[in-house]
Amino acid sequence: MLAAIRPAGKPPGLWALPKGQIDQGEPAEQTALREVAEETGAHGRSLGKLGDVKYVYTWPPKPAEGERIFKVVSFFLVRYSRGRLGDIPPAQRHEVDEVRWLPLEEAPGLLAYRGEQEMAARALARLAELAL
């Protein structure tokens, strides 16, 4: 199973992986574990990095006025250990409208973003290698 979120303000049926900004001095792997807990309520341990997704976007989203931002998002395979899905800390509730478990085998077809679909496919392959 894969913990997925519907980011705040996004339409029903749009599923994404938890992610967020790295705090100063925080390793990327620790950021991934923190963001999963903050955005889903689930805690876990890392089984290693799956890869990076790189993209460019404009902010604010008006091309004539916005600044082009280059972003790298690192994804890690996280094994669930405890917590209740949807038990989101009050400070993060504004970021997420819905949390749910998705069957990992179906996740590449259910996630909205191409890079995240690829990470779900990599997670399936990694779990097969690890025989988990």
What are these regions (language model features)?
Residues L17-G51:
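The catalytic Nudix box helix
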Residues R122-L130:
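C-terminal alpha-helix
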Residues F75, G86-A120:
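NUDIX/MutT-family hydrolases
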Residues M1-L2, Q21-Q24, V72:
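Conserved N-terminal beta-strand and adjoining loop/helix that marks the start
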Residues G41-R84:
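Active-site segment of metal-dependent pyrophosphate-handling enzymes
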Residues A16, F70, W101:
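Short aromatic/basic micro-patch
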Residues M1-L17:
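N-terminal strand-loop-strand
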